[in-house]
Amino acid sequence: MLELLKVSITGDLSSGKTEASRVFQDLGAYVISADKVSHSFLVPHSHIGRRVIDLLGPEVVVDNAFDRKVIAEKVFDNLVLLQALEAILHPEVRRIIEEQYYQVAKERKHPLFIAEVPLLYEIHYAKWFDRVILITADENIRRERFTKKTNCSDLNFYQRCARFSSNEEKKMHADIVIENNGTKEELRHKVEEYFYALKGAL
């Protein structure tokens, strides 16, 4: 029997998901990121890469690699294209996350399995996990973090936020809600508390 708790971290854009995941990793949890997984397998000459090129056109490949800025420009204003792209990528992301979970569980080296999945509810993936942690922050704080980190405009922030479902709705379904309106140190203390609570959950 695999006795390793499956925990997903999710939340809106620039809420602090990655920072929370980093704290869990520092404490000994195994952490996998859905975004990093998709980056790892999305190469032009792979089967999935060819499907993406067929969908979006050859101009999304620059210097034998996918240009993520070009992809973003193509899909963020086109819901049909965005959904078609996600239909290609998300099943593979899920397959890799689940495959990795079973490998990590067999090794018995980590107290928790953490998957950072930004669009967890939007892709109907929450039920696979034993616990869901929702990281939240006020919109003005998230906007400031996003624009400072990316040098993108407020408009770009709101366009990207449109992909996420209602935060209030997600709060109703999450097992744990961590508010992240303060400092990184404050977030760390909150995550540490939940780490030890979850560690003893099985």
From Swiss-Prot:
GO terms for molecular function: ATP binding; dephospho-CoA kinase activity. Gene3D superfamilies: P-loop containing nucleotide triphosphate hydrolases. Keywords: ATP-binding, Coenzyme A biosynthesis, Cytoplasm, Kinase, Nucleotide-binding, Transferase. The keyword Cytoplasm applies. It holds the Pfam family CoaE. InterPro entries: Depp_CoAkinase, P-loop_NTPase. Its main location: cytoplasm. ATP binds at residues 14-19. It catalyses: 3'-dephospho-CoA + ATP = ADP + CoA + H(+). It is found in: Cytoplasm. The keyword Mitochondrion does not apply. Its EC number is 2.7.1.24. Pathway: Cofactor biosynthesis; coenzyme A biosynthesis; CoA from (R)-pantothenate: step 5/5. GO terms for biological process: coenzyme A biosynthetic process. It comes from the Bacteria. One of its GO terms (cellular component) is cytoplasm. Residues 6-202 form the DPCK domain. SUPFAM superfamilies: P-loop containing nucleoside triphosphate hydrolases. HAMAP family: Dephospho_CoA_kinase. Catalyzes the phosphorylation of the 3'-hydroxyl group of dephosphocoenzyme A to form coenzyme A. Belongs to the CoaE family. This is Dephospho-CoA kinase.
